[in-house]
């Protein structure tokens, strides 16, 4: 099923018993996090808090949607897939678009035409009138404190916008960039835009600032998009394709956009809330600390200040929010689902890879386990280096374990068995110093710069060892079949 907006998706989830309305008054200050965390860990439904309340007990005017993508199944549904396993088909499409192959013949060429036609017909449709601009706050009427912005953890410094899709455009780019960056509330019209220097929005801003050092930089932040657009913003879309175009492909219909009232950026026409504004030259503020997806409070640092000049919204808008914390949290669940999208992308570049897994306990990207069909000595090390360098999503992966294709990468018992029986700690450990590392990783010696470790837990080939290698014990299939046949009679 395809969803034209967030409300469509909510209605479908509610119809299937996958969304729970909460009429009881609940505060965005800590209470929503407590409830959402319990529900997510129980693999429970999405939550619509209908009566969020302020500290003094008065009611906010808008409901809060939380735990929307709290299970991999709901992520798949949001991407238009029938199941999590079907997400690999989306990955295969992205792999083809990233590096299209010449057709192998007339039949192959014709088989690819429908896909190419679908993709290029998904250019966004720009409309003049949009639901997201039914209500407009401008000037003194702009007041972010009227929104039920979530305060997630006890030592968080302030409420935090967590599910905002930030829309930017670089001075030399035709298409816009969509990114999700947390934003600290510091005033009725002020947010801190915490984008790291390598992220798309930050790069657009840096390029603009070089050419226009004294000019305010236009930005829009979208809250409450349709699921295809939200998930398109966190998917490794090829540079030749816009996130809006990819969202249209997932949805099966063109993304409807509308121009912002105060700038030329285009935003989803059926979004719930849109913040329009600018980043003024040299205006920064100290951000944090905040509890993050690592399970720790992160360091403070200075980031640009986003001045909100206008808030537009639908009638009776829904505020979409989440929290981040020690896994599992909603980003970790997203990582589990998107893992299936990554596999075909890696296999396109490295056909020897049979599976790839980012354990959610590893903060969704800091550790990877890869299985492969090994073909020569040193092959596992090539795969390690390839994974670190091929997709920018894995630039911050600290640990990569490589195993043979007889090991299930999603079963820690098998992975640990391979590590402890097929590895020599000295020979089979790869250490790389002074590599890009997650800014939030306080374990690294220098902020943004640290080490990586690769563990080669594959069977060793001649040239890698001088010893006779062990043979894996395997059961006799005939005996196994015989015992299967009499198992019930044994009464065990």
Swiss-Prot record:
Family: Belongs to the UbiD family.
Domain of life: Bacteria
Pfam families linked: UbiD, UbiD_C, UbiD_N
Membrane topology of this protein: Peripheral membrane protein
Pathway: Cofactor biosynthesis; ubiquinone biosynthesis
Cofactor: prenylated FMN; Mn(2+)
Function: Catalyzes the decarboxylation of 3-octaprenyl-4-hydroxy benzoate to 2-octaprenylphenol, an intermediate step in ubiquinone biosynthesis.
UniProt subunit comment: Homohexamer.
One GO MF term attached to the UniProt entry: metal ion binding
EC number assigned by the record: 4.1.1.98
Protein name: 3-octaprenyl-4-hydroxybenzoate carboxy-lyase
Catalytic reaction list: a 4-hydroxy-3-(all-trans-polyprenyl)benzoate + H(+) = a 2-(all-trans-polyprenyl)phenol + CO2
Entry annotation: catalytic residues: 292 (proton donor)
Residues given in the record as Mn(2+) binding sites: 177, 243
GO cellular component: cytosol; plasma membrane
Record-linked NCBIfam families: PRK10922.1, UbiD family decarboxylase
Sequence positions that bind prenylated FMN: 180-182, 194-196, 199-200
Localization of this protein: Cell membrane
GO biological process terms, semicolon-separated: ubiquinone biosynthetic process
Signal peptide interval: none
Keywords on record: Cell membrane, Decarboxylase, Flavoprotein, FMN, Lyase, Manganese, Membrane, Metal-binding, Ubiquinone biosynthesis
Top enzyme category: lyase
UniProt remark on cofactor binding: Binds 1 prenylated FMN per subunit.
């Amino acid at each position: 099923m395809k969803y034209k907006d967030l409300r469509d998706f909510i209605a479908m989830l509610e119809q299937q018993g996958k969304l729970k309305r909460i009429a009881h008054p609940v505060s965005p200050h800590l209470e929503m996090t407590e409830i959402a965390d319990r529900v997510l860990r129980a693999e429970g439904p999405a939550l619509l808090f209908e009566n969020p309340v302020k500290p003094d007990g008065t009611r906010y005017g808008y409901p809060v949607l939380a735990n929307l993508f709290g299970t991999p199944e709901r992520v798949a549904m949001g991407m238009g897939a029938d199941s999590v396993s079907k997400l690999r088909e989306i990955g295969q499409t992205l792999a083809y678009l990233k590096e299209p192959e010449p057709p192998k013949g007339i039949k192959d060429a014709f088989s690819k035409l429908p896909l190419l036609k679908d993709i290029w017909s998904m250019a966004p449709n720009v409309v003049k009138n949009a639901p997201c601009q039914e209500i407009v706050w401008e000037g003194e009427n702009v007041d972010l404190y009227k929104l039920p912005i979530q305060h997630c953890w006890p030592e968080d410094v302030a409420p935090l916008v967590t599910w905002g899709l930030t829309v930017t455009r670089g001075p030399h780019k035709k298409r816009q960039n969509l990114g999700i960056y947390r934003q600290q509330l510091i005033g009725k019209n002020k947010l801190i835009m915490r984008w790291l220097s390598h992220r798309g929005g930050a790069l657009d801003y840096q390029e603009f600032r070089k050419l226009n050092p004294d000019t305010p930089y236009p930005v829009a932040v979208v809250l409450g998009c349709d699921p295809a657009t939200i998930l398109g913003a966190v998917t490794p879309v090829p540079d030749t394709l816009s996130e809006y175009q990819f969202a249209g492909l997932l949805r099966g219909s063109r993304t409807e956009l509308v121009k912002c009232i105060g700038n030329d950026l285009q935003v989803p026409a059926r979004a719930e809330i849109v913040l329009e504004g600018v980043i003024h030259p040299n205006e920064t503020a100290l951000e944090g600390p905040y509890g993050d997806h690592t399970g720790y409070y992160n360091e403070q640092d200075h980031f640009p200040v986003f001045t909100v000049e206008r808030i537009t919204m639908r009638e009776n808008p829904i505020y979409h929010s989440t929290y981040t914390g020690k896994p599992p949290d909603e980003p970790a669940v997203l990582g589990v689902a998107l893992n299936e999208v990554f596999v075909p992308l890696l296999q396109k570049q490295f056909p020897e890879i049979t599976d790839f897994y980012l354990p959610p306990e590893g903060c969704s990207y800091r550790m990877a386990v890869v299985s492969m069909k090994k073909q020569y000595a040193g092959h596992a090390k090539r795969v390690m280096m390839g994974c670190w360098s091929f997709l920018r999503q894995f630039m911050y992966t600290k640990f990569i374990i490589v195993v043979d294709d007889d090991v299930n990468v999603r079963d820690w018992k098998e992975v640990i068995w391979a590590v402890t029986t097929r590895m020599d700690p000295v020979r089979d450990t790869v250490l790389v110093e002074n590599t890009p590392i997650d800014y939030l990783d306080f374990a690294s010696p220098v902020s943004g710069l640290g080490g990586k470790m690769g563990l080669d837990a594959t069977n060793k080939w001649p040239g890698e060892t001088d010893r006779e290698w062990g043979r894996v014990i395997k059961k006799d299939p005939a005996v196994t079949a015989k015992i299967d046949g009499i198992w019930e009679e044994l009464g065990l």
